[in-house]
Swiss-Prot record:
Name of the featured protein: Cytochrome P450 monooxygenase FGSG_08207
Location of the protein in the cell: Membrane
The species this protein was found in: Gibberella zeae (strain ATCC MYA-4620 / CBS 123657 / FGSC 9075 / NRRL 31084 / PH-1) (Wheat head blight fungus)
Membrane topology classification: Single-pass membrane protein
Binding positions for heme per the UniProt entry: C441
Annotated glycosylation sites: N104, N155
Gene Ontology MF terms: heme binding; iron ion binding; monooxygenase activity; oxidoreductase activity, acting on paired donors, with incorporation or reduction of molecular oxygen
Pfam hit, one: p450
Membrane spanning residue stretches: 10-30
Length: 522
């Protein structure tokens, strides 16, 4: 009796009553703001905290938010209420491919809204975007600038910069204090050399650092409400890059074929719409991180997964040794096309590294009411105005798709035999590091060719060893969560990544590396 009275008094006490009332009110408000879901739409996953729960979790956990939802509910598609809006989260590979092929799902609204936040361009240019045909022409120019011939030229120019670096390594070798920062800085300049030509504005260590400060702060530019110090550093780095690009764009001649078509085409489109001088640099900054922020961390993880496994190194060396041409003057020529055609283990190992580190979240807006269909023939209704997110990291980690060892690097995974047609189809659909559909990354072949060429030279020409000789500590570092503003995870602590020592291999002491791609040579 006393216990019952005590409980009654507790429940009737003012703080408890107010707390219960607040919870009830929050619940009712949450239901009032909650978007309605049609019976044909994907089922709704309500947040544990009404209204703000999913939004807060997604901002805090980024791509890991979707992995947690998948682990808890394991649904192929779901409606996730974000504040008062609908977001469809798709994690089934076949549904994702159905969405990529659906013309009623568009990336363009994200491009317009995100571009102004990322670049900070003024309202006058935003008006040009909204009222002219510049955006479709701009997107088309990106694909026109990455046709096979243009990609071959990008490959050779970028790898020429790489070869100058590794050709300079003497017989006593080279010690690298931080493997990640070495690869990051080397390949950032190499990529920009290929894009911007002999007057490349991104050569100084300070501007390279600015590119990565800008890239790291992209999420803060999108929301402007978190961490003002990081936001301020990001804006300052962005401005320095914009000034360098603005000066370069002002002086760039439209007929200068030493500049990549990828850049010339899009600058030409903007000039046709009256954008000149510094404004070109202000806009160009919005894409400068694209060819670096994903391919370079991928190279790092590929490098670490391969060179920390001596057995994989030996297998890959045996494969690539047959595709190089050794000249009488110590020149060693690597043809990128031969790697693509004759080095299946190299390609498999790269895809495996990409699968493990890539957490790309693809965004679309539903422009008109439409449906997408899964492998069992079931269709789901998607309502106009809703957003769609397709987190590749969930598919890349799926044990259903990749097997029980999905979390483990296995260099030959993409050479697996004996898969059923259904398993093979699922794997093809599930690997989406470059997105898909009309907006698949136009520079994907450039990104992979850079990596294949560089790794071939390292495998054949150099022994890659831990600086201190401790092989047990020479391993891939812990991986950070992938932010939704980029696609590839970085090391959790970039500054503490292990060092590497490169020593020329016996028989390759004087090798001078050259690269060929298609009919393009250095």
């Amino acid at each position: 009796m006393a216990l019952t009275e005590g409980i009654s008094e507790l429940l009737l006490s003012k703080p408890v009553v107010l707390g219960l009332a607040a919870c009830a009110l929050l619940f009712l408000i949450g239901r009032a703001f909650e978007p309605t879901v049609d019976a044909l739409e994907p089922p709704m996953l309500r947040p544990s905290i009404p209204i703000f729960g999913h939004f807060y979790s997604m901002m805090k956990d980024q791509e890991a938010f979707f992995k947690r939802l998948d682990k808890k509910y394991h649904m192929p598609i779901a409606t996730v209420p974000i504040l008062k809006y609908k977001m469809y989260a798709i994690t089934d590979p076949i549904l994702v491919q159905s969405a990529y092929c659906n013309k009623n799902l568009s990336f363009t609204p994200f491009a317009i809204n995100g571009a102004q936040k990322v670049t900070g361009f003024d309202d006058d240019y935003h008006k040009v975007l909204m009222e002219t045909n510049v955006l479709p022409e701009y997107f088309k120019s990106l694909y026109d600038g990455t046709t096979a011939q243009h990609i071959h030229q990008l490959n050779v120019t970028s790898l020429k910069h790489v070869s100058q670096h590794i050709n300079s390594i003497q017989e006593n070798g080279m010690t690298i204090d931080n493997t990640y920062l070495w690869l990051r800085n080397l390949m950032t300049v190499a990529t920009c050399e290929a894009l911007y030509g002999p007057d490349n504005p991104i050569r100084s260590d300070s501007l390279v650092e600015d590119i990565w400060t800008f890239e790291t702060g992209l999420a803060y530019l999108f929301f402007h409400i978190f961490n003002s110090k990081t936001l301020q550093r990001t804006k300052e780095a962005r401005r320095r890059i914009q000034l360098a690009l603005g000066k370069w764009c002002t002086n760039m001649r439209q007929d200068d074929e030493r500049v990549s078509a990828y850049i010339r085409n899009r600058v030409g489109i903007l000039r046709n719409y009256g954008v000149e001088g510094q404004k070109l640099g202000d806009i160009e900054v919005g894409l400068i991180h694209v060819p670096t922020s994903n391919s370079i961390p991928t190279l790092f993880w590929f490098f670490m997964h391969v060179f920390t496994r001596p057995d994989v190194v030996e297998q890959m060396r045996a494969e690539v040794e047959h595709i190089v041409q050794r000249g009488p003057d110590e020149t060693v020529t690597v043809n990128i096309d031969d790697i693509l055609e004759r080095c299946p283990l190299m390609i498999s190992a790269y895809r495996e590294a990409s699968r493990l580190c890539n957490g790309f979240t693809c965004n679309r807006i539903v422009m008109e009411e439409t449906t997408i269909t899964d492998r069992h023939g079931r269709s789901y209704l998607l309502k106009k105005g809703s957003s769609v997110k397709m987190p590749a990291g969930v598919m890349h980690a799926s044990q259903e798709v990749w097997g029980e060892d999905a979390a483990v690097f296995r260099a030959d995974r993409f050479l697996d035999k004996g898969l059923t047609s259904e398993q093979a189809k699922l794997r093809r659909a599930a690997l989406t590091p470059f997105g898909g559909g009309a907006h698949m990354c136009p520079g994907r072949n450039f990104a992979t060719a850079e990596i294949y060429g560089f790794m071939t030279a390292l495998l054949l020409g150099y022994n890659v060893e831990p600086v201190d000789g401790k092989w047990d500590a020479f391993k891939p570092p812990p991986m950070a969560t992938c932010p939704q503003s980029t696609s590839v995870c970085k090391p959790e602590d970039e500054a503490s990544v292990c060092g590497t020592r490169l020593i020329r291999r016996s028989g390759w002491e004087g090798a001078q590396w050259k690269f060929v791609s298609g009919k393009v040579t250095e």
